Amino acid sequence: MKLRSFIGSRVIKTGIAVLLTAYICEWIGWSPVFAVITAIVTIEPTVSDSIRKGLIRFPASAIGAAYAVLFIALFGNSPVTYALSAVFTITTCFRLKLHDGLLVATITSVAMVDVIHSNYVMEFFIRLFTTTIGLSVSTLVNMFLLPPDYQKNIQTKVSSIAQELGKQIQGIYYCLLHVDEINNESKYLDKLLELDKLIIRAEILSRYQTNDSKYHFTENNQEKFKDIKTQLHFLRIMHYHLTNVIDHPKEQINIDEKEKNELLNVSSYIAQVLKKELAYNSDDIQDKRTRLNELFWKEKHRTHNLSSDMLNKLPFELVMLYELISILELTEDYFYTANLHKENAN
């Protein structure tokens, strides 16, 4: 476990794949160099990527080997052969959209120039077989040895995102409802950008796990992961609504002290629940949603008395209320899904 955490699972798997590939090639009596090169580049973050890219790298390597044999036959072992092998391999792979196999194909092509001396056709097929060995061994190692499992990592990130989002919800509404804090708005924008990056990283891991779920997950595990993905989706939409609030053009906020305190109270409640400082209670959510809806319709009725010039854009008071109602509903959805996840775990 210490070794795995120190150098990483992919590095360990790459080393094992290289070792097994070299042993197999030595046992058959073939040079392991090309098989090892293929094995190194085939270990991907997910098993599905290893298989998908392997199916691209095999024909790409065949193209590289074919060009190497062709130009060796025409020009012998010369600088021209190296150049033409590289150029034609890159061009052909690019034209055929074999982008994931371009690097290994080019390396195979130029490396073959120095090792082929006779029997060109036999050398070509040997390279295809060694490439197949490298692809197969790496894919099997990636699938069965320390298989990629991002679920715990994603779950940890989801929890961290929820807590940070809670801080931002409370901080942004406090900032907007206090004139002396309005200068801190840019600080919250920067924090929202950082939070967006964290969400994107979690979404990338989620895609990795989704791609590999058909290889390793039991039905129960798939349900758990589906719940975690749904929670991440709700957090993404919360972030979107919060960004809408802070990005909306602002003028002087026309809101009385009672309404201001209600907004601050609800934003603080959401923050405490997301940060797990307060236990989630669906009745509390319903109560706060009812009060916010009353404020929203009251504010909307007030805007009917405004002039048409003032209604060219939605009043910021309505924006704050609408977005907070949306965030509150998403908070309820988030914890409903979290409770489902706990039930599935049991």
UniProtKB/Swiss-Prot annotation:
It comes from the Bacteria. It is found in: Cell membrane. Pfam families: ArAE_1. Its main location: membrane. InterPro entries: ArAE_1, UPF0421. This is UPF0421 protein OB2406. PANTHER family: MEMBRANE PROTEIN, MEMBRANE PROTEIN-RELATED. It is a multi-pass membrane protein. It comes from Oceanobacillus iheyensis (strain DSM 14371 / CIP 107618 / JCM 11309 / KCTC 3954 / HTE831). The chain crosses the membrane at residues 16-36, 55-75, 102-122, 128-148. Keywords: Cell membrane, Membrane, Transmembrane, Transmembrane helix. Belongs to the UPF0421 family. One of its GO terms (cellular component) is plasma membrane.
